[in-house]
Amino acid sequence: MRTLALHTAMLLLVALHAQAEARQARADEAAAQQQPGADDQGMAHSFTWPENAALPLSESERGLRCICVLGICRLL
């Protein structure tokens, strides 16, 4: 009876250890994704020209904006 209890306890410890390792691996992956520079491909960049830019702009060009995502830029 003691042997059965010891084997059951050891089996539970092994199962808990495996779960802890899996959770730690997921936490490490999440931490790596949150660090800046880890994956810049999904980052969007936006550029806006101020109203008092050095070059005079026509009325249609005022507030011209460029949005770049994954290497594709489009003007708004």
Curated annotation (Swiss-Prot):
Propeptide residues per the UniProt entry: 23-64, 74-76
Keywords on record: Antibiotic, Antimicrobial, Defensin, Disulfide bond, Fungicide, Signal
PTM note: This is a cyclic peptide.
GO biological process terms held by the UniProt record: antibacterial humoral response; antimicrobial humoral immune response mediated by antimicrobial peptide; cellular response to lipopolysaccharide; defense response to fungus; defense response to Gram-negative bacterium; defense response to Gram-positive bacterium; disruption of plasma membrane integrity in another organism; innate immune response in mucosa
Biased composition regions of type Low complexity, renumbered to the chain: 30-44
GO CC term, one of those recorded: extracellular space
Claim: Transmembrane helix is one of the keywords in the record: no
Start and end residues of each stretch annotated as Disordered: 25-45
SS bonds (residue pairs): 68-73
Segment forming the signal sequence: 1-22
Superkingdom, natural source: Eukaryota
InterPro entries in the record: Alpha-defensin, Alpha-defensin_N
Similarity comment text for this entry: Belongs to the alpha-defensin family. Theta subfamily.
Subunit structure: Forms a cyclic homodimer; disulfide-linked.
Role description: Has antimicrobial activities against bacteria and fungi.
Protein name: Demidefensin-3
